[in-house]
């Protein structure tokens, strides 16, 4: 049986669709694109009207879940996750989740509390991320490491070696999980190798979104290729 989910992405994102194709054929992603609400502002949330319309369209495709794959948007308002998931659910008629929610919940599901955030973002956005994970998910950020990307295009140009080298620089015993936010940051095919090298789980935006999808569908299937989170699919 094929299961269908919707995923909303910024119009500039060039990675999410590629990583969705790595999923088993039984899980089909249907994508809607969103325009930024504030042109020229770095990592601003997408337009409400785009979110509503694209969610409505995805609902006509009979998706069972809608995911907003725009982690940075959740960092700009305390109630953003709650407001946007209500908007998405109202449009599509199905449950909704943000990728930021998925990341936080995934870390908790792995039984961890202390994280290192290795992101493509600037220092200011990283600080927002640390506050978000603390206030929304009770996670302590032990280390923040950013690459200073100023837009989504720059994130898409990063490679797995950027994250791996950052892990090597900042790794320490108190870090329980490496968190790599950013849906346009290509990570999926490197997660298992990172975990083997550093001996701890890695949670990334797209991987956590797929975990949330598997949990929502409750099929019991595991996907062992992309790190511990998808190999175990822990409840959370």
For each feature predicted by the language model, list its residue ranges.
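Short, acidic/small-residue loops that bind anionic groups at enzyme active sites
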Residues: 85-107, 194-213
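Hydrophobic alpha-helical
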Residues: 164-194, 209-210
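N-terminal glycine-rich anion-binding loop in soluble enzyme alpha/beta folds
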Residues: 1-53, 121-159
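Conserved beta-alpha
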Residues: 84, 91-150, 230-235
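Periplasmic-binding protein-like
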Residues: 64-69, 116-118, 175-182
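Short, flexible loop segments at boundaries between secondary-structure elements
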Residues: 146-154, 200-222
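Short, well-structured alpha-helical segments in soluble
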Residues: 48-62, 162-175
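Glycine/small-residue-rich loop that forms an oxyanion/phosphate-binding "nest" at active or ligand-binding sites
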Residues: 55-101, 105
């Amino acid at each position: 049986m094929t299961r269908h989910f919707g995923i909303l992405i910024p119009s500039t994102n060039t990675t999410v669709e590629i990583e969705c194709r790595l999923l088993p054929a039984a899980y089909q992603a249907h994508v809607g694109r969103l325009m930024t609400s504030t042109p020229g502002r770095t990592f601003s949330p997408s337009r409400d009207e785009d979110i509503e319309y694209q969610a409505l369209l995805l609902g006509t495709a009979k998706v069972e879940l809608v995911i907003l794959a725009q982690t940075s948007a959740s960092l700009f308002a305390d109630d953003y996750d709650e407001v946007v998931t209500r908007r998405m659910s109202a449009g599509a008629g199905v449950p909704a989740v943000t990728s930021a929610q998925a990341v936080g919940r995934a870390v908790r599901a792995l039984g961890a509390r202390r994280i290192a955030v290795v992101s493509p973002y600037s220092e200011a956005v990283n600080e927002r991320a640390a506050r978000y994970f603390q206030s929304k998910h009770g996670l302590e950020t032990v280390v923040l490491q950013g690459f200073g990307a100023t837009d989504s295009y720059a994130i898409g140009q990063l490679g797995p070696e950027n994250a791996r080298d950052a892990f090597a620089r900042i790794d320490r015993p108190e870090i329980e999980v490496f968190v790599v936010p950013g849906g346009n940051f290509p990570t999926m095919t490197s997660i298992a190798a990172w975990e083997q090298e550093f001996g701890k789980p890695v949670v990334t935006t797209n991987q956590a979104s797929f975990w949330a999808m598997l949990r929502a569908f409750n099929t019991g299937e595991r996907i062992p290729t992309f790190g511990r989170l998808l190999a175990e699919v822990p409840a959370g």
